[in-house]
Amino acid sequence: MKLEFAPINIPLARRLQTTAVFQWVFSFLLLAQCCIGIFLSLVLARLWLILALYVLWLYLDWETPQAGGRRWEWVRNWTVWKYFKDYFPIRLVKTCDLDPQHNYIMGFHPHGVLVAGAFGNFCTNYTGFKELFPGLTPYLHILPFWFRCPFFREYAMCVGLVSATKKSVNHVLSKENGGNISIIVIGGAEESLDAHPGSLILHILKRKGFIKVAFKQGAHLVPVFSFGENELFQQVPNPKGSFLRCVQERLQKIMGFAMPLFHARGIFQYSFGLMPYRMPIHTVVGRPIPVKQTSHPTQEEIESLHQQYLSALRDLFEEHKERYGIPEHESLIFT
């Protein structure tokens, strides 16, 4: 493989952007393991007092990721996130106002490999969410196992991440006077295995849990499509039925999360590495679908609302696709 090295005279701003994204990729892939290593080092060093205090803290704080988390605006305002946003860049696009007197479920599509658009828009304060949607607070739900990792869980909660459990979503949406948004990556880990450049496959036909929660809480549904999310990385070919895909799906069932074999560019060269490509991400927030609170919705009501959501998502995509580089003949594929 011939390596294409980055030029030496790159502007400082671009170097800072690369550094910001590198620390984010590192945090996503290795920070949790490092935190576990720190915890084990405390055990080996027999620092029992520190361990006892932290274990007590874990016991008292264990349910916090399912109770709205513990965001810290200072962390969400770190300058590193501005450079992170500018690397791609990431842009949040509003199609209509959202009434802060309601609670909402935003369905985020597609998952992509590392969900960069969801993190940049809803876990930092640099893409204008507060200005576009005043009076609303976003909560991005991620897999619960991240919050079982010592030390890492505190960092994750600081940026507004919460657990992707039914209890957690219900807690966010139970705010009496409205103003909360649960952002759920509907396709989940399974969808990340289809996150190839140009792919428009969404795993959504069997995903109806968010519909049931919307009925229970009376939360309005908002489809969100992030154009460019699947263009950030290449993946090793893994078509359905291939040996690699079978192994990945098996590991996902065992561990609860997927392991896409991805690559893109490096820090000092453009040919290979785990850094994402500099590709623009446009996250478009659609119009809300009103939902009447219903404690025990019938199967017909669930199916009807699910179909309404699919139709709204498809309409959102069709309305904006050509503006963001999708050919006219391309359409979403629901599986």
Swiss-Prot record:
It catalyses: a 2-acylglycerol + an acyl-CoA = a 1,2-diacylglycerol + CoA; a 2-acylglycerol + an acyl-CoA = a 1,2-diacyl-sn-glycerol + CoA; a 2-acylglycerol + an acyl-CoA = a 2,3-diacyl-sn-glycerol + CoA; a 1-acylglycerol + an acyl-CoA = a 1,2-diacylglycerol + CoA. It comes from the Eukaryota. The chain crosses the membrane at residues 24-44, 47-67. One of its GO terms (biological process) is triglyceride biosynthetic process. InterPro entries: DAGAT. Its EC number is 2.3.1.22. One of its GO terms (cellular component) is endoplasmic reticulum membrane. The keyword Ribonucleoprotein does not apply. The keyword Transcription does not apply. Keywords: Acyltransferase, Endoplasmic reticulum, Glycerol metabolism, Glycoprotein, Lipid biosynthesis, Lipid metabolism, Membrane, Transferase, Transmembrane, Transmembrane helix. It is an enzyme of class 2 (transferase). Involved in glycerolipid synthesis and lipid metabolism. Catalyzes the formation of diacylglycerol, the precursor of triacylglycerol, by transferring the acyl chain of a fatty acyl-CoA to a monoacylglycerol, mainly at the sn-1 or sn-3 positions. It uses both sn-2-monoacylglycerol (2-acylglycerol) and sn-1-monoacylglycerol (1-acyl-sn-glycerol) equally well as substrates, and uses sn-3-monoacylglycerol (3-acyl-sn-glycerol) with lower efficiency. PANTHER family: 2-ACYLGLYCEROL O-ACYLTRANSFERASE 1, DIACYLGLYCEROL O-ACYLTRANSFERASE. This is 2-acylglycerol O-acyltransferase 1. It comes from Xenopus tropicalis (Western clawed frog). The lineage of its organism: Eukaryota, Metazoa, Chordata, Craniata, Vertebrata. The gene is mogat1.
